[in-house]
């Protein structure tokens, strides 16, 4: 019998359980995001890959829990819940936007503390964490609610009806602000001699999104870094044709990682 522990149920959504999968793909959603969209990717992968989608406090079944205060507590919680699973079989991380920074912070912690590393890191819509371009994003949480709504509309990806309903809108703004507050507490200074990771990194970006400093991801790994631009804006990954490209590409990377 394949049972999720209570901590696991709380922190991870796994819509398509595959206990015999060869690999696990751990997905980290965007700021203000829940687990459902990336958890559904499970159906697009073959039986060799099981998909987990990470859930932070303050949303979905964790709506009554206080939001995370900082990146350290986010990383510690995710690590403690997932550690056993990550030691069990090869795993990769996929993060979009805010989720990219969390996935990188978790990867750093796993490497430093446990000598564990993803076989591949998939980054989407995000500057490298030591890039100058990343700094303005860290200041976003202080802005007015209306500015956040305007920013959300420009980015797209948020259903219009969410922004129409007063309660849903308030909740979305609050969650976004809290997620951005977590981002403020994260800093990664790249030491000249110490390249923290050795896995390959693939960076994806929407061709019409604000350009991200993807080249700088070369500075955090001794592995290869590849860059792909897919049609669309910041939420290009929600387009069905792009979802198919992403899941096929991720599958190839995971299946060849062991060769």
At which residue positions do the language-model features occur?
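Hydrophobic alpha-helical signal peptides and transmembrane signal-/tail-anchor segments
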Residues: 1-5
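Domain-scale detector for complete catalytic domains at protein termini or as standalone homologs
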Residues: 6-94, 101-259
């Amino acid at each position: 019998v394949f049972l999720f522990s209570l901590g696991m149920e709380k922190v991870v959504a796994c819509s398509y359980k595959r206990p015999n999968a060869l690999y696990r793909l751990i997905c980290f959603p965007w700021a203000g995001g829940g687990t459902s969209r990336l958890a559904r990717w499970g159906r697009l992968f073959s039986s060799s890959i099981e998909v987990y989608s990470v859930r932070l406090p303050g949303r979905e079944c964790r709506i009554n829990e206080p939001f995370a205060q900082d990146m350290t507590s986010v990383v510690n919680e995710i690590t403690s819940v997932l550690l056993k699973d990550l030691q069990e079989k090869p795993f990769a991380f996929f993060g979009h936007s805010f989720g990219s920074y969390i996935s990188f912070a978790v990867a750093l912690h796993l490497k430093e503390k446990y000598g564990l590393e993803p076989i591949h890191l998939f980054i989407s819509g995000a500057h490298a964490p030591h890039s100058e371009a990343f700094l303005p994003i860290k200041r976003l949480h202080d802005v007015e609610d209306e500015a956040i709504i305007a920013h959300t509309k420009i980015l797209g990806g948020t259903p219009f009806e969410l922004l129409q309903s007063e309660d849903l809108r308030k909740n979305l703004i609050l969650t976004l602000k809290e997620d951005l507050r977590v981002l403020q507490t994260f800093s990664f200074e790249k030491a000249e001699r110490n390249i923290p990771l050795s896995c390959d990194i693939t960076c994806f970006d929407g061709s019409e999104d604000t350009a991200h400093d993807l080249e700088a991801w070369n500075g955090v790994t001794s592995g290869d870094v590849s860059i792909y631009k897919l049609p669309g804006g910041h939420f290009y990954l929600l387009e069905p044709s792009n979802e198919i490209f992403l899941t096929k590409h991720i599958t190839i990377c995971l299946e060849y990682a062991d060769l």
